[in-house]
Amino acid sequence: MFNDGAYTGEVSAHQLAKLNISYSIVGHSERRQHFNETDEFVNVKVNNLINKEITPIICFGESNDQRTEGNYMDFLLNQIENSTKGLRKDKVDEIIFAYEPIWAIGTGQNASLQDIVEVISKVKEFISKKSFFNEEKIKFIYGGSVSPDNSYEILNSKIIDGALVGGASLDVDKFIKIIESVDL
């Protein structure tokens, strides 16, 4: 996400602002994997979006290797820190963080609610200790193979603020079931 200019196949924060776009996903695992986007580039995108008053949805997540080797939490906290470097505290209340465990996307493996809550709780604690945010204002959504089978548990957890639905959003019936699983 460049601030402005012509970048074929990309869109700038300026263009999004002119279209009155309110939210933009940055750091998605597919962008990191296929386009080699780094945390530092995600940070540039986040700053460009905030400067245009667009809420960034910052994706972060670990691979299966990082998870099984046991160093995943350090990796995740590093992603968060590098993606939010240099942000003014008064500008970051609107950021949404999307926990997207790469090992649970399209693999048939699902993160348990306990896995999700563990990561989100530790990341919230880390962020508030670093004084980036007021812990109560930090918003987290989950995006690791959300389906009608796991959406009720995820979307009705007190610590998870929503879902970043991937493949299931392409099937209208599945997507409607996910939406209907929310207790209002």
PLM features: what roles do these ranges have?
Residues 1-184:
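Active-site loop-to-helix "anion-binding N-cap" substructures in soluble metabolic enzymes
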